[in-house]
Amino acid sequence: MWTSLAEFTCREPIRRGSQAIAPDGSDFDTPRLRGRLIRGATSGTWSRRPSRVAYDWDLFAEEAALECLLFESHGILDAPWALWLPGPPSVSGIHNLLVHLRFRRPPERWFSHLPADWQSAAALRYIRATARGFGMRVPLPEPTAFEEAESVARWLASARDRAGRAVLKAFASSATRVAEAARQLRIDLRGCLIFAGGESLTPARIAHIRATGATVFARYVATETGWIASACPFGDSPDAMHVFTDRLAVLTAPADSAVDDDAPLLFTTLSAGAGKILLNTDLGDSGRLRRRPCGCPMGHAGLNLQLSGVHSQAKLSIEGITVAVAVITRALDRVVAAAGGPPDSYQLRQEEDGAGARRLVVRLGPALTGVDDGALLRGFFAELPRHGPDAKLAARFWRESSAIAVRRGSPTLSDAHKMRPLTVSGPDHSPRFDVARGRLR
């Protein structure tokens, strides 16, 4: 018994034998949470109608207990810490804030890639006023553009000088930008710890961040499940994480589905606080699982299932924002068609530089010779927000960060002479894998 990504996102009916069920996105909702505290949009959904996920204080209480274990494992319970995560309407920043309010450890600073809209600002003022009544100071999100990573690096160094340790939670690409700013300004980040999530913590990113003196560890969170796993200081690698098996079960799909020894991960929710009810459900991520005893507080609590090498199968993660490949290609198809180009006249390529920073390249084929590169890119950023809240957020992020470029070149074909919708390359631009029909090959 399992639920595929296509079934969970309602792209395909659930077929078992002669039975077929055409689910709606809300069919997977936890009934007791309907209409509860806050809602977030699922990340990288393949469905045309984005699925919404509800959260309440029961979920935050569960996650707060796990966050306490994580901070205790690293010896940072009393260390000053900050967020560099987007504020509302994005759910990532407010989710982390509310979890930490649950155990009375709000961040000292909240750097946000985007300014809050008026509705979100009103909600944040209410949260601040309520927290103040309990003796807690909650910072407002400070708009901090990608090119202003220097501000975050300087805060880390200053907080470290003041308290001996300093902690930052950020997307992996944002953490890389902080490290690059520190490198250019010769800011020593020894004694600083960064929890990086939202994207794969690749070896290049790890090396680039460590070169500043900082330490970095992976975190794994999904909108549908909440907290999934976090890394302690004693793992095999910074991306080797303890799975929070008290609130969900994880196993891998059959071996014949694996790619490069990494199999799709299947999740089953065990907690009544989870926003979605999952039963061996594929969320589109792959990774490696193994049992490993550990002497850290999380290990002593019985969390001895280790997850490493997590990466997205059918989704793109650029600058911490994850969007389905199908959403990007649907938007580009419309823009290319409007410019008079035929189908398959472009190709997507994800590149990673030596510092671990990722960007998306739209490679235009010979059929689009007369199309202006800048006009096509502007058309893409205008079209993408029409494809759901995740796509709208991605358009804002990627435009501001210059994370997308246009180049010229003929598309590459697979060994079977099929068009590769997406190719992925490493720091030397050598190909690693391609995604065809929404699957890794």
Q: Where are these predicted regions, by residue range?
A:
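Nucleotide 5′-phosphate-binding alpha/beta core
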Residues: 1-162, 166-169, 183-184, 188-189, ...
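Short, well-structured beta-strand/strand-turn elements
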Residues: 3-6, 215-223, 339-340
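Conserved AMP-binding/adenylate-forming
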Residues: 192, 196-294
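Alpha-helix N-cap/helix-start capping motif
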Residues: 172-173, 199
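AMP-binding/adenylate-forming catalytic core of the ANL superfamily
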Residues: 168, 266, 274-399, 417
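Adenylate-forming
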Residues: 175-190, 208-210
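Short amphipathic beta-strand and strand-loop transition segments with alternating hydrophobic
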Residues: 251-254, 345-353, 405-409
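Flexible loop/turn segments at secondary-structure boundaries
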Residues: 88-92, 175-178, 202-204, 225-226, ...
